[in-house]
């Protein structure tokens, strides 16, 4: 049966751990898996501009013996004349997998339903699951097994990163805290899904408004941009409403002494995070950025094996 990765909870706890174990192997032995040798082609589709996603998938597919076919929807029929399902049926005749960085989650679900090759969510408005695999790998490297650790996300709790932390963190058995003001909270449905998962993994989920309370005793502190692509007209309002959630050195002092700081990048310095934090000794954002490569390679290898 074809497996897709559209949401973080598309992987069970055991499957998530398996992918992360494989990522550790591929980081240590970069060319040890070559499932795309031939070479086979992977379509990598972009509705949004990208640096880390484009580079990490292109390099990773090449490492696995394949050829990345980079497609911009601005120069294709997808999203215009042709449906996602029809595009998928065309692509599956020629590629081994489809990776799509897009807006709506519904388009990804439509594409996955219409194809027999794996579809990977490289980012949507709702979730950023590939980034979370990289983040969990980074936590493993710097703090050990994520299970039982406390992770606090500060800022826009309704953004795709916050929602992915809820699902992926719960799957990993973490205690996930989202600190956000009213109007910036995660989807109730996503919180409910995360709570259900956490009940079986020993994790927990909390949504709070007080940033100090949320960071107190945290092992991992995370934030993301407050002004995502397409929301530039809301910048002034967002900066005013989210200002109390900036990650500063003072706020980090409420976390455990060896807490780490994560940010998926790009960062708006002096907005969601102070430069002295992102450049400081607790920051592991550059390892996190590199780990996109290893985590996504592992995901592709795993999906191709299952499918």
Curated annotation (Swiss-Prot):
E.C. numbers: 2.1.3.3
Pathway: Amino-acid biosynthesis; L-arginine biosynthesis; L-arginine from L-ornithine and carbamoyl phosphate: step 1/3
GO biological process: arginine biosynthetic process via ornithine; citrulline biosynthetic process; L-arginine biosynthetic process
One GO cellular component term noted in the UniProt record for this chain: cytoplasm
Binding site for L-ornithine: 160, 224, 228-229
Main enzyme class: transferase
Coiled-coil regions listed in the entry: none
Subcellular location: Cytoplasm
Cited NCBIfam families: orni_carb_tr, PRK00779.1
Protein family according to the UniProt entry: Belongs to the aspartate/ornithine carbamoyltransferase superfamily. OTCase family.
Protein name as catalogued: Ornithine carbamoyltransferase
Organism, scientific name: Clavibacter michiganensis subsp. michiganensis (strain NCPPB 382)
Gene name tied to this protein: argF
